Amino acid sequence: MELTSKDGNMVVDFYPIKDWSNNLIPNRILKVLSFRGDQQKKMIISRDEFYYQVREYIKECKYKVTNEFMPAQFINQEV
């Protein structure tokens, strides 16, 4: 899912994550912050935190949902 700020400068992407065996990792979401097209930060958050943050970005920060496609991303289990 992609959320974009009103001015279009800040983009927040959220993706489910999977291991190298292609198994989805439950209750974990990859969050990627980008500013003007440059990736700033990646972090793994809980699914509850994902729901909370999406709500806050939309309600409080007035971000718009610009893409609902959420392909699972590979992540190292040791992270």
Regions found by a protein language model. Give the residues of each.
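Short, hydrophobic/aromatic-rich segments at coil-to-beta transitions
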Residues: 1-3, 30
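Acidic, low-complexity, intrinsically disordered interaction modules
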Residues: 11-72
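Short intrinsically disordered terminal tails
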Residues: 1, 75-79
